[in-house]
Regions:
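Mid-domain, small-residue-enriched loop/turn segments at the edges of structured enzyme/sensor domains
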Residues: 33, 45-100
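Structured C-terminal helix/loop/strand segments within mature extracytoplasmic catalytic/sensor domains
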Residues: 51, 98-123, 132, 139-192
Length: 192
């Protein structure tokens, strides 16, 4: 299985545990994907982006996935907010991961969904869901933007995709509160 070394070039601040690991530690592509999703690990994300190629290559892959308004312009962390996307495109991406056999292999889709079921931050959309709901998701936080996007599976079997992105003053708690409240309203409507 292919591995990548954690060099100082990739080590970055912000989210994730890789920033604290020994230089030249080797990580499989799968482990990097797991850390990118479950911890929002910026170092793992940057390593995987270079595995795809240049920023041009990363953005071409994004276009190939049918995402026209999503663009990566800089490495993570991107506190300036130069990378951008839309809630609609995140929803489309989630649909493709969950349902589209032409998007990724079944094995890759299963791995991604498994990782999404083990995200460490469950204080956003997940906090607004009813008891027994399963949530497969990915969070993002750059201080002035807070987001959560995922697939909800209610105890009654209803399934839906939800994406909530909140602009906010830097690290303001109101962004989190908004996402939790919106999640609760959506959940109560969807599981009727």
């Amino acid at each position: 299985e292919e591995t990548m070394p954690l060099t100082e070039y990739f080590r970055t601040e912000g989210s994730g545990s890789l920033q604290f690991k020994a230089a030249m530690s080797e990580y499989t592509i799968d482990k990097l994907a797991e850390l990118m999703i479950t911890e929002s690990d910026n170092s793992a994300t940057n390593m995987l982006m270079t595995r795809v190629g240049s920023m041009v290559d990363v953005n071409q892959a994004i276009r190939d996935w049918g995402l026209k308004n999503t663009e990566v312009q800089t490495w993570l962390p991107d506190y300036a907010g130069t990378n951008h996307t839309t809630a609609r495109e995140m929803g489309r991406m989630l649909y493709n991961i969950d349902e589209n056999d032409k998007f990724l292999t079944q094995e890759s889709r299963a791995k991604i969904l498994n990782y999404m079921g083990h995200v460490h931050n469950n204080r956003l959309i997940h906090a607004g869901l009813g008891a027994g709901a399963v949530f497969l998701h990915k969070t993002g936080d750059i201080g002035t933007m807070l987001g959560d996007a995922g697939i909800v599976i209610a105890p009654n079997g209803k399934k839906y995709i939800v994406v909530i992105l909140a602009n906010r003053p830097h690290n303001a708690i109101e962004g989190k509160d908004f996402i939790v409240h919106a999640s609760e309203l959506i959940y109560n409507y969807m599981v009727k």
